[in-house]
């Protein structure tokens, strides 16, 4: 309701994609809008992949955002070097949310447990994920959810993981030019097939020097622009002027 705009001094968004959506949908006054992006901690980088080594993929997103698509893709992946670790659960939002919602995804978790190239691990705190990220080579997120940003993508990019995701929502802004983007498809079976092909293709080039340089540049980019010193400074400058 545009008549309520005078009640607010500022609207702060975590991506330009989100700002544009709200501006167009609700007629927000642009002079009251600001984008300050999410920040991440320093993360230990993965070592460059050597050809012939096991290829470990991480997926640490909530189950309704694309896990079914990823499990469908893993059924089609034939490279014996590839395994996927799934840290997906409703527990990330607390016990009450877990108790009310996690049962809806029991069959999906069971499917993950039965696949030979998938390890279903379930919930682990973010501190565990970040401290173990250097053990992985790739991050796969076939998002069917319009993200306003994506901290898990940023963390994996900072950690030097080759990332594959869709171009839905603000993911293309968050990832910039670094991930492999799979065009979103409402046909989720077809999206699974595309993701399987992307995983196989990515696995075949992980050892190449150009990919190693790409991931080094990627990590430096994220650490330069999404570190908490930079983001914190943006908040401090904004709040100093706003207050």
PLM region spans:
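Short beta-strand->alpha-helix junction loop in the catalytic core
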Residues: 17-18, 35-45, 90-93
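Acidic donor-binding loop of glycosyltransferase active sites
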Residues: 134-148, 161
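Conserved donor-binding/catalytic core segment of Leloir-type glycosyltransferases
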Residues: 12, 49-66, 71-75, 85
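A short, active-site helix/loop in glycosyltransferases that binds the activated sugar's phosphate group
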Residues: 1, 7-33, 40
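A charged, aromatic-enriched C-terminal amphipathic alpha-helix characteristic of glycosyltransferases
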Residues: 186, 207-240
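Nucleotide-activated donor-binding/catalytic signature segment of Leloir-type glycosyltransferases, i.e.
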Residues: 98-124
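Short hydrophobic beta-strand element within catalytic cores of glycosyltransferases
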Residues: 162-165, 172
